[in-house]
Protein backbone atom coordinates (compact mmCIF):
# COMPACT_ATOMS: atom_id res chain seq x y z
CA UNK A 1 0.00 0.00 0.00
CA UNK A 2 0.94 3.66 -0.22
CA UNK A 3 1.88 5.68 2.83
CA UNK A 4 2.32 9.38 3.56
CA UNK A 5 5.76 10.50 4.70
CA UNK A 6 4.48 12.42 7.72
CA UNK A 7 8.01 12.81 9.08
CA UNK A 8 9.02 14.74 5.98
CA UNK A 9 5.90 16.89 6.23
CA UNK A 10 6.74 17.67 9.84
CA UNK A 11 10.29 18.62 8.83
CA UNK A 12 8.99 20.95 6.11
CA UNK A 13 6.65 22.65 8.55
CA UNK A 14 9.37 22.96 11.18
CA UNK A 15 11.78 24.51 8.68
CA UNK A 16 9.18 27.02 7.47
CA UNK A 17 10.21 29.74 9.91
CA UNK A 18 8.63 32.44 7.75
CA UNK A 19 5.24 30.71 7.88
CA UNK A 20 4.97 30.64 4.09
CA UNK A 21 3.15 27.30 4.18
CA UNK A 22 -0.50 28.12 4.75
CA UNK A 23 -2.21 24.87 3.80
CA UNK A 24 -1.60 21.15 3.35
CA UNK A 25 -3.33 19.59 0.34
CA UNK A 26 -4.43 15.95 0.50
CA UNK A 27 -6.18 13.87 -2.16
CA UNK A 28 -8.39 11.30 -0.46
CA UNK A 29 -8.28 8.89 -2.21
CA UNK A 30 -5.39 9.78 -4.45
CA UNK A 31 -5.46 9.39 -8.21
CA UNK A 32 -4.24 7.19 -9.81
CA UNK A 33 -2.75 5.31 -6.84
CA UNK A 34 -6.24 4.89 -5.35
CA UNK A 35 -4.85 5.25 -1.82
CA UNK A 36 -6.95 6.67 1.01
CA UNK A 37 -5.42 8.59 3.90
CA UNK A 38 -5.10 5.98 6.66
CA UNK A 39 -6.55 6.67 10.14
CA UNK A 40 -3.12 7.05 11.75
CA UNK A 41 -1.92 9.34 8.98
CA UNK A 42 -5.03 11.45 9.29
CA UNK A 43 -4.50 11.88 13.02
CA UNK A 44 -0.87 12.89 12.49
CA UNK A 45 -1.74 15.38 9.75
CA UNK A 46 -4.45 17.04 11.81
CA UNK A 47 -2.09 17.28 14.79
CA UNK A 48 0.71 18.78 12.69
CA UNK A 49 -1.55 21.29 10.96
CA UNK A 50 -3.02 22.40 14.27
CA UNK A 51 0.43 22.78 15.82
CA UNK A 52 1.79 24.85 12.93
CA UNK A 53 -1.40 26.81 12.20
CA UNK A 54 -1.81 25.30 8.75
CA UNK A 55 -5.16 24.56 7.11
CA UNK A 56 -6.06 21.32 5.34
CA UNK A 57 -7.46 21.34 1.81
CA UNK A 58 -8.89 17.89 1.08
CA UNK A 59 -9.92 16.86 -2.43
CA UNK A 60 -12.38 14.01 -1.78
CA UNK A 61 -14.18 13.76 -5.11
CA UNK A 62 -13.43 10.02 -5.40
CA UNK A 63 -14.11 9.14 -1.76
CA UNK A 64 -17.36 7.25 -2.38
CA UNK A 65 -15.83 4.97 -5.01
CA UNK A 66 -14.25 2.32 -2.79
CA UNK A 67 -12.58 -0.63 -4.49
CA UNK A 68 -10.26 -2.59 -2.16
CA UNK A 69 -10.06 -0.28 0.86
CA UNK A 70 -8.47 -0.84 4.22
CA UNK A 71 -10.65 -0.33 7.29
CA UNK A 72 -11.14 2.98 9.04
CA UNK A 73 -11.13 5.42 6.13
CA UNK A 74 -12.87 8.73 6.85
CA UNK A 75 -13.50 11.93 5.00
CA UNK A 76 -11.72 15.08 6.12
CA UNK A 77 -15.03 16.81 5.48
CA UNK A 78 -16.40 17.90 8.86
CA UNK A 79 -13.02 17.71 10.65
CA UNK A 80 -13.20 19.94 13.73
CA UNK A 81 -9.62 19.79 14.98
CA UNK A 82 -8.15 22.17 12.40
CA UNK A 83 -9.44 24.53 9.71
CA UNK A 84 -10.42 22.22 6.85
CA UNK A 85 -11.68 22.83 3.32
CA UNK A 86 -13.20 19.67 1.81
CA UNK A 87 -13.77 19.71 -1.96
CA UNK A 88 -16.39 17.73 -3.85
CA UNK A 89 -18.56 18.13 -6.92
CA UNK A 90 -21.02 16.69 -9.41
CA UNK A 91 -18.47 15.81 -12.10
CA UNK A 92 -17.35 12.82 -10.01
CA UNK A 93 -20.49 12.25 -7.90
CA UNK A 94 -22.54 11.86 -11.08
CA UNK A 95 -19.67 10.61 -13.27
CA UNK A 96 -20.57 13.54 -15.52
CA UNK A 97 -17.54 15.61 -16.61
CA UNK A 98 -19.83 18.30 -18.02
CA UNK A 99 -21.58 18.85 -14.66
CA UNK A 100 -19.31 21.65 -13.49
CA UNK A 101 -20.81 22.26 -10.06
CA UNK A 102 -18.50 21.97 -7.08
CA UNK A 103 -18.62 22.85 -3.43
CA UNK A 104 -16.39 23.39 -0.43
CA UNK A 105 -17.34 22.31 3.08
CA UNK A 106 -15.57 24.40 5.70
CA UNK A 107 -15.06 22.97 9.18
CA UNK A 108 -12.78 23.40 12.19
CA UNK A 109 -12.57 25.79 15.14
CA UNK A 110 -15.48 28.23 15.15
CA UNK A 111 -13.57 31.50 14.77
CA UNK A 112 -11.47 30.11 11.92
CA UNK A 113 -14.54 28.80 10.12
CA UNK A 114 -16.37 32.10 10.38
CA UNK A 115 -13.43 34.09 9.02
CA UNK A 116 -12.75 31.61 6.22
CA UNK A 117 -16.42 31.50 5.23
CA UNK A 118 -16.58 35.29 5.10
CA UNK A 119 -13.64 35.40 2.73
CA UNK A 120 -14.93 32.54 0.61
CA UNK A 121 -18.25 34.34 0.22
CA UNK A 122 -16.41 37.29 -1.32
CA UNK A 123 -14.41 35.04 -3.66
CA UNK A 124 -17.47 33.06 -4.73
CA UNK A 125 -19.51 36.19 -5.35
CA UNK A 126 -16.80 38.05 -7.27
CA UNK A 127 -15.13 35.26 -9.23
CA UNK A 128 -17.25 32.08 -9.10
CA UNK A 129 -20.90 33.09 -9.33
CA UNK A 130 -23.45 30.38 -10.13
CA UNK A 131 -26.11 31.20 -12.70
CA UNK A 132 -29.78 30.80 -11.86
CA UNK A 133 -30.09 28.19 -14.60
CA UNK A 134 -27.42 26.02 -12.99
CA UNK A 135 -28.82 26.59 -9.49
CA UNK A 136 -32.22 25.28 -10.59
CA UNK A 137 -30.61 22.08 -11.84
CA UNK A 138 -28.85 21.32 -8.54
CA UNK A 139 -31.78 19.72 -6.61
CA UNK A 140 -32.66 17.18 -9.34
CA UNK A 141 -28.97 16.36 -9.81
CA UNK A 142 -28.62 15.75 -6.08
CA UNK A 143 -31.65 13.46 -6.21
CA UNK A 144 -30.00 11.28 -8.86
CA UNK A 145 -26.66 11.05 -7.04
CA UNK A 146 -27.28 7.90 -4.92
CA UNK A 147 -28.38 5.78 -7.88
CA UNK A 148 -25.59 7.07 -10.08
CA UNK A 149 -22.99 6.40 -7.39
CA UNK A 150 -24.23 2.83 -7.11
CA UNK A 151 -24.09 2.30 -10.88
CA UNK A 152 -20.55 3.62 -11.15
CA UNK A 153 -19.40 1.58 -8.14
CA UNK A 154 -20.87 -1.56 -9.69
CA UNK A 155 -19.06 -0.83 -12.96
CA UNK A 156 -15.65 -0.08 -11.44
CA UNK A 157 -15.76 -2.95 -8.94
CA UNK A 158 -16.90 -5.39 -11.63
CA UNK A 159 -14.15 -4.29 -14.00
CA UNK A 160 -11.55 -4.61 -11.26
CA UNK A 161 -12.65 -8.20 -10.62
CA UNK A 162 -12.42 -8.90 -14.35
CA UNK A 163 -8.95 -7.35 -14.44
CA UNK A 164 -7.74 -9.73 -11.74
CA UNK A 165 -9.17 -12.66 -13.71
CA UNK A 166 -7.46 -11.61 -16.93
CA UNK A 167 -4.12 -11.07 -15.22
CA UNK A 168 -4.30 -14.48 -13.52
CA UNK A 169 -5.08 -16.10 -16.88
CA UNK A 170 -2.24 -14.37 -18.72
CA UNK A 171 0.34 -17.03 -19.53
CA UNK A 172 3.20 -14.54 -19.65
CA UNK A 173 2.43 -13.41 -16.09
CA UNK A 174 4.59 -10.29 -16.03
CA UNK A 175 1.84 -7.68 -15.58
CA UNK A 176 0.16 -7.05 -12.25
CA UNK A 177 -2.05 -4.38 -10.73
CA UNK A 178 -1.24 -2.35 -7.64
CA UNK A 179 -3.85 -2.49 -4.90
CA UNK A 180 -6.49 0.12 -5.67
CA UNK A 181 -8.32 1.20 -2.54
CA UNK A 182 -10.66 3.63 -4.28
CA UNK A 183 -11.33 5.79 -7.32
CA UNK A 184 -11.84 5.07 -11.01
CA UNK A 185 -8.34 4.13 -12.10
CA UNK A 186 -5.75 1.47 -11.41
CA UNK A 187 -2.02 1.29 -12.00
CA UNK A 188 -0.72 -1.64 -14.00
CA UNK A 189 2.89 -2.62 -13.42
CA UNK A 190 4.96 -4.26 -16.14
CA UNK A 191 8.70 -5.03 -16.52
CA UNK A 192 10.68 -1.81 -16.26
CA UNK A 193 12.82 -2.81 -19.24
CA UNK A 194 9.84 -1.72 -21.35
CA UNK A 195 9.81 2.01 -21.97
CA UNK A 196 6.45 3.51 -21.01
CA UNK A 197 6.36 5.78 -24.05
CA UNK A 198 7.17 2.90 -26.38
CA UNK A 199 4.38 0.84 -24.87
CA UNK A 200 1.82 3.60 -25.40
CA UNK A 201 3.06 4.19 -28.96
CA UNK A 202 2.70 0.46 -29.61
CA UNK A 203 -0.90 0.60 -28.40
CA UNK A 204 -1.58 3.50 -30.73
CA UNK A 205 0.08 1.85 -33.73
CA UNK A 206 -1.33 -1.65 -33.40
CA UNK A 207 -4.70 -1.05 -31.74
CA UNK A 208 -5.64 2.59 -32.14
CA UNK A 209 -5.68 2.83 -28.34
CA UNK A 210 -3.78 4.98 -25.89
CA UNK A 211 -2.96 5.16 -22.20
CA UNK A 212 -1.38 7.28 -19.51
CA UNK A 213 2.20 6.28 -18.66
CA UNK A 214 3.32 6.34 -15.06
CA UNK A 215 5.61 9.32 -15.46
CA UNK A 216 2.51 11.46 -16.03
CA UNK A 217 1.97 10.98 -12.30
CA UNK A 218 5.60 11.18 -11.16
CA UNK A 219 5.88 7.47 -10.47
CA UNK A 220 9.31 6.73 -8.97
CA UNK A 221 10.40 4.36 -11.73
CA UNK A 222 9.58 3.15 -15.22
CA UNK A 223 7.02 0.39 -15.81
CA UNK A 224 3.55 1.73 -14.98
CA UNK A 225 0.39 2.45 -16.94
CA UNK A 226 -2.84 3.98 -15.63
CA UNK A 227 -5.99 2.16 -16.70
CA UNK A 228 -9.55 3.48 -16.34
CA UNK A 229 -12.19 1.23 -14.78
CA UNK A 230 -15.08 3.20 -16.27
CA UNK A 231 -15.29 1.52 -19.66
CA UNK A 232 -18.15 -0.80 -20.61
CA UNK A 233 -17.22 -4.31 -19.38
CA UNK A 234 -16.57 -5.77 -22.84
CA UNK A 235 -14.54 -2.75 -23.90
CA UNK A 236 -12.62 -2.85 -20.62
CA UNK A 237 -11.67 -6.51 -21.08
CA UNK A 238 -10.58 -5.71 -24.63
CA UNK A 239 -8.44 -2.83 -23.35
CA UNK A 240 -6.71 -5.12 -20.86
CA UNK A 241 -5.97 -7.67 -23.58
CA UNK A 242 -4.55 -4.91 -25.76
CA UNK A 243 -2.15 -3.90 -22.99
CA UNK A 244 -1.10 -7.50 -22.38
CA UNK A 245 -0.50 -7.91 -26.11
CA UNK A 246 1.59 -4.74 -26.24
CA UNK A 247 3.70 -5.95 -23.33
CA UNK A 248 4.25 -9.29 -25.05
CA UNK A 249 5.32 -7.54 -28.27
CA UNK A 250 7.70 -5.31 -26.34
CA UNK A 251 9.31 -8.39 -24.81
CA UNK A 252 9.28 -10.10 -28.22
CA UNK A 253 7.35 -13.10 -26.93
CA UNK A 254 4.01 -12.53 -28.68
CA UNK A 255 2.40 -15.38 -30.57
Where are these regions (language model features)?
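PLP-dependent enzyme catalytic core of the Aspartate aminotransferase-like
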Residues: 10, 14-15, 202-211, 217-255
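Conserved glycine-rich beta-strand-loop-beta hairpin in the small C-terminal domain of fold type I
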Residues: 139, 154-164, 175-190, 221
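Short hydrophobic/aromatic beta-strand micro-patches
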Residues: 105, 187-189, 228-230
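Helix C-cap/helix->beta junction micro-motif
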Residues: 51-52, 80, 207, 250
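A generic structural signal for well-ordered alpha-helical segments
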Residues: 49, 77, 167, 203-204
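Conserved core segment of the aminotransferase class I/II
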Residues: 78-157, 252
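Active-site phosphate-binding strand-loop segment of PLP-dependent enzymes
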Residues: 2-71
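A short linear hydrophobic-aromatic micro-motif
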Residues: 173-177, 210-215
Amino acid sequence: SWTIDTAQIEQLLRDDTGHRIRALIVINPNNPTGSYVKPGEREQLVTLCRAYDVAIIADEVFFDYALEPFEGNRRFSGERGVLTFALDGFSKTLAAPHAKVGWIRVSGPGDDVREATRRLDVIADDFLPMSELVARAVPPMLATAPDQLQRVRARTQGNLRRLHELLRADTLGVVDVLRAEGGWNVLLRFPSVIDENELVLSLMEHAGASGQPGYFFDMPSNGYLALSLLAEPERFASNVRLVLGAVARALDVSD
